[in-house]
Every structure is written in structure tokens, then in C-alpha cells.
Amino acid sequence: MDNYKKILVALALDPNSDRPLVEKAKELSANRDAQLYLIHAVEHLSSYGAAYGVAAGVDVEDMLLEEAKKRMNEIASQLNISSDHQIVKVGPAKFLILEQAKNWGVDLIIVGSHGRHGIQLLLGSTSNAVLHGAKCDVLAVRIKGS
């Protein structure tokens, strides 16, 4: 592997899914004196708004965003990652990850893979899109038991 200096970890904010990614990121950053960056995308809930009224979708989205920020801060504090090296935004994960990787100038993106069948199921649609859209290296870490 190259000498990575900026590593972006795309988190699901699920302890079982994130643990292997965080462990791999810690291992790689310690060996290379690299900076870690964290990202999580809260998907738009426009379909909920249509079904239950716009306010319902917006309220749920705001609640999910606040909860995600809280969980992200907990993970970041455990890893000693400053607030300017973490982001939680609303939008499609694949686009937000690629955009933020470019903005931060990262040289490695770490994503989770699920190990099912076929490339789409193996990586998942977000990981697959990141793999094919990234201008830097992408490391897919196997999520056991998913």
C-alpha cells in the first residue's frame, strides 16, 4: 500500500458495521502517521414527506441528522478526531463521500463491503459507486455477519 496521509472513513454509524472500518483506519493511520477523516450521509426522506406530509419528512430528517451528528461526535472523540475532520450531511452517500474526499484531498477512502453475491451485492451500491468514482485509492473492508 502507498504511504497514505489522509484517510477518509465512510461510516454507517452502526457499531457492528463501523468497528472493522475504524480498526483498519486506526491501523493504517498509526503505521503512516496519517490524518483520519470521518463522513456519514443521512439519506433524504422525501418519500416520508410525500406519504405523511412534508413536515413529517423534514422533522424525521432533522431528528436523524441530529442523532447522526451525536453518534459521529462520540466516535470522533474516541479517535481524537477534531470537528473539522468529520462531517454528517443529508444527501446520497455516494455523492457526498466522493465530494468530501475531493474537498479534503484524501488519498484513501475506506468503505464497508458485505460479501454477498455479485459486485453490487459484494460491495453494496454506495461502496461500488465510490470505488468507480473516486480519484484516490479505495479500501473495501469486509463486514462479517452481514
Swiss-Prot record:
Asked if the record carries the keyword Transferase, the reply is no
Q: Does the keyword Cytoplasm apply?
A: yes
Q: What is its main location?
A: cytoplasm
**Stored InterPro entries:** Rossmann-like_a/b/a_fold (IPR014729), Universal_stress_UspA (IPR006015), UspA (IPR006016)
Under Pfam families, the record lists: Usp
GO CC terms of this entry: cytoplasm
What does the entry give for GO biological process? response to stress
Localization: Cytoplasm
Source organism, top-level taxon:
Bacteria
SUPFAM superfamilies linked? Adenine nucleotide alpha hydrolases-like
> Which keywords annotate this record?
Cytoplasm
The family line of this record is: Belongs to the universal stress protein A family.
What is the protein's known function?
Involved in stress response.
Binding partners and assembly: Homodimer.
Q: What is this protein called?
A: Universal stress protein A homolog 2
Q: Taxonomic classification, please?
A: Bacteria, Pseudomonadati, Pseudomonadota, Gammaproteobacteria, Legionellales
